[in-house]
């Protein structure tokens, strides 16, 4: 909480300065830490009751981090049920990075170029993963599959985006606000 308060104070004091990007980087780190707290709550490791942990994880994931708790819980449960099992673990599905030689061998175009250099490109690509995780979570909520507490998750996400994005885009010039958001997501 103190870190978020310091970021708000620092942002107000800096005004229209490109040093705001340092605040954005700090927020990226803080949101990552809150995401880890949501992870621990989802594993029921923080509070004494399961339902209380679920509520906390949903609040932290959706309301603070800005990612769908139900999407993450579904994906993470499948991962824990079948760790590193091809076709069952969503964490090793074909995406930008190939975990299997067969996937790398069948890659074409840009994905092939990335796959051939993925060892060198891993950390630069990691800067895009925050954006990817947010997009996948939103796609899950907007999808047709049943989502437990979809309305609650949408409400928390809307509140979170209003609290974070509206001040950034109202108080900073448009280009600086876009850079702020980009840095925050890259560090996340």
What are these regions (language model features)?
Residues 1-34, 61-66, 119-130, 146-188:
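Alpha-helical bilayer-embedded segments of polytopic membrane proteins, i.e.
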Residues 26-146:
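Membrane-embedded catalytic scaffold of the fatty acid hydroxylase/desaturase
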């Amino acid at each position: 909480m103190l870190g978020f308060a310091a970021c708000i104070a620092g942002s107000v004091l800096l005004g229209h300065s490109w040093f705001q990007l340092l605040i954005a980087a700090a927020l990226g780190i803080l949101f990552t830490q809150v995401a880890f707290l949501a992870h621990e709550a989802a594993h029921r490791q923080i509070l004494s009751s399961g339902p209380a942990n679920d509520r906390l994880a949903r609040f932290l994931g959706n309301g603070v981090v800005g990612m769908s708790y139900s999407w993450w819980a579904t994906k993470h449960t499948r991962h824990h049920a079948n760790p590193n099992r091809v076709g069952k673990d969503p964490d090793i599905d074909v995406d930008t990075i190939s975990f299997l030689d067969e996937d790398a061998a069948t890659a074409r175009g840009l994905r092939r170029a990335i796959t051939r250099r993925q060892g060198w490109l891993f950390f630069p690509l990691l800067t895009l993963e925050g954006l990817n995780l947010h997009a996948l979570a939103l796609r899950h909520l907007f999808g047709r599959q049943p989502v437990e507490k979809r309305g609650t998750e949408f409400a928390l996400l809307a509140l979170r985006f209003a609290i974070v994005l509206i001040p950034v885009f109202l108080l900073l010039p448009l280009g600086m606000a876009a850079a702020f958001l980009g840095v925050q997501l890259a560090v996340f």
